[in-house]
Amino acid sequence: MTANSQPAPPPTGTPTPLSREWWKDAVVYQIYPRSFADADSNGVGDLDGITSRVPYLAALGVDAVWLSPFYPSALADGGYDVDDHRDVDPRIGTLADFDRLVAALHAAGIRIMVDIVPNHSSNRHAWFRAALAGGPDAPERALYHVRPGTGPGGTEPPGDWRSMFGGSAWERIDDRTPDGAPLTGPGTPRPCQWYLHVFAPEQPDLNWDHPAVREDLLTTLRFWCDRGVDGFRVDFAPGMAKDMSEPYRPMAEIPWWPLPEDGSHPLLDRDEVHDIYAAWRALLESYDPPRFAVAEAGVAASRRPAYAASLGQAFNFQMQDADWSARSIGWAIDGGLADEAVCGSTTWVLGCHDTPRVTTRLGFDPADDAEGGEPDPSYPAGIAQRMARAWIGADGVAPPQNAVQGERRARAAAMIVMALPGAMYLYQGDELGLPEVPDIPEGRLQDPIAFRMRGKEKGRDGCRVPLPWTATGDSFGFGPNGGAEPHLPQPVGWGAHAVAVQEADPDSTLSLYRDGLRLRRRVWGAANGEPLEWVRRDERVLAFARGGVQCWTSFDADVPLPDGDVLLASVPLGCVESDGDGGNLERAVNVLPADATAWIRPAAPRSLPRPDRS
């Protein structure tokens, strides 16, 4: 968070002019930089690699890219442990590389968003190093949540709060003199001190009641806006405002989920967080055109609109959580439309860097769920997510997973999302139908969840495996042949999913995404502002209409489609003969098979001949 001395260069390109609130119906492509494209052969994706693939992004048809963290980091949490929010990790590039990327994207009509991680810094951040080096009375400790321990000499943590990554949310500081004598703890006048970390110990939580913390983040926002950034994704947006008054409430009273709807959780979703965002919004809107931010806000649905109002947009993860059923997908659509009604926009998310791949998730049958039990009627989702994590933990052995079915359903789900009003966030590789990689060897795992929850969770590395660009090569085109091995291992058959392979196949998942995103802009974009109307909604079928075009999805069996032009289908359609008008003529009727979606422009009703009354 210390300011880098390099000034922003003058703008060298601007994206195609769009609405001042372009993000409300944009397609935003999430790039996990370390796994996208490696230009310098070090086994880690980099900014120049992304720049080299801008033509691919343009051909895909996205409106913006969102870069996950590319800042200096020890990678204790995939880059979300940030050493300096205003610089670039030298393994990924330089600020000059970043400026070239911005110019290339803008020249292609693509906007750029960057990840901001405000809840915590890394333990290598200059502030935290000073807080440790300065001893128990270091003023920098006020920038974090440092508290005395309990028990003899303060050797026990201040409370029983648990980290989201497993283990205690408190880490003890080992304060000693230069010659190694303890400054705190048993045998000294002062108790041991502990710092709070909601995530990994390498990610100490910042104290957002401190004015220096607030001002520094505003400086960071200005820094990137001045370099041409168009928007920000706010990591863990509900987390900054905290009630640290004692006594600390026991963890049994404050689970991480579900969160209370009254803002009473001491660590998450407190009303005071919106006071912080008010200053951010004022800064972002001082630019012309205005910048915006989208909140990663995993909060109760009733609390989500406040984040959209504060920042511009908030993620709705209901579609990502949904299982493959008409009930679950319909519930997700209802949630997104409710957000749109309140906020004027909504978001649709099928996957991201934190969740098992959609192609894998949708290959599970909830009937095979080992936990079983009656589903929560207020939350008819999450079974496939849970089964996928169990499957990953078992190295892809159990529970049973149908890869072919998963890919088929993921294609159908993508077409549903493309047809809905609002913004679509697309995670890199989902357009290739990439599956989760469940069997990464333990020695190659990077995610702290795998280590802090050993035996329970294997973590998120399986959705972060470097992309395949070519069918062959040392890293399937991720990096040059002869370069370093990719930072995460790619499966042997990864090349079958490669961009080069799919570009040559008009029926590939990549071709479906390209066709779908092109039609989304031309067909569904023309319907923006028009209400979504349900055509059919039951246990087998979801069908809705917007602007004279219908989106039909079958979850069960073959479904006859209405007469009209089929604009796009996730699989080849069947065809049957049906009785025509009057029962004496036959006509062909398109049939939508199970686990498939089609877009149709219905035919105009045919006028029947007037009866002869002479």
Where are these regions (language model features)?
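Active-site and adjacent substrate-binding regions of carbohydrate-active enzymes
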Residues: 2-563, 570-614
